[in-house]
């Protein structure tokens, strides 16, 4: 996961705990979860729109004589 080992993750979590305190962690995690959910939703919408555009047959060209 991003090239981080177990020790690095534990160290990062300890720093976050020291910076924000135990009382704020659930609130931070909730906000992070909501943000990730919104990001994934937007990503899915963009992928669906892209697939619609790619799968549409090309418009027929008008020929002039």
Curated annotation (Swiss-Prot):
- What is the predominant subcellular site recorded for this chain? membrane
Tell me, what's a Pfam family for it? TatA_B_E
Q: Which domain of life is it from?
A: Bacteria
Q: Please give, as recorded in its UniProt entry, the membrane topology of this protein.
A: Single-pass membrane protein
Keyword Oxidoreductase present in the record's keywords: the answer is no
Q: GO cellular component annotations, sorted alphabetically?
A: TAT protein transport complex
- What keywords tag this UniProt record? Cell inner membrane, Cell membrane, Membrane, Protein transport, Translocation, Transmembrane, Transmembrane helix, Transport
Any transmembrane segments, and where?
1-21
GO biological process per UniProt: protein transport by the Tat complex
Q: Which GO terms describe its molecular function?
A: protein transmembrane transporter activity
- InterPro entries recorded for this chain? TatA/B/E (IPR003369), TatA/E (IPR006312)
Q: Where does the UniProt annotation locate this protein?
A: Cell inner membrane
Q: How does it assemble?
A: Forms a complex with TatC.
User: What function does this protein fulfil?
Assistant: Part of the twin-arginine translocation (Tat) system that transports large folded proteins containing a characteristic twin-arginine motif in their signal peptide across membranes. TatA could form the protein-conducting channel of the Tat system.
Please name the PANTHER family in this protein's record: SEC-INDEPENDENT PROTEIN TRANSLOCASE PROTEIN TATA (PTHR42982:SF1)
What family does the Swiss-Prot or TrEMBL record give for this protein?
A: Belongs to the TatA/E family.
Q: What is this protein called?
A: Sec-independent protein translocase protein TatA
The organism's lineage is:
Bacteria, Pseudomonadati, Chlorobiota, Chlorobiia, Chlorobiales
């Amino acid at each position: 996961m991003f090239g981080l080992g177990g020790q690095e993750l534990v160290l990062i979590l300890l720093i976050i705990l020291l910076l924000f305190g135990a009382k704020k962690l659930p609130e931070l995690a909730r906000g992070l979860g909501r943000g990730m959910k919104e990001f994934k939703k937007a990503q899915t919408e963009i992928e669906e729109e892209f697939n619609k555009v790619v799968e549409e047959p090309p418009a027929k060209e008008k020929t002039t004589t």
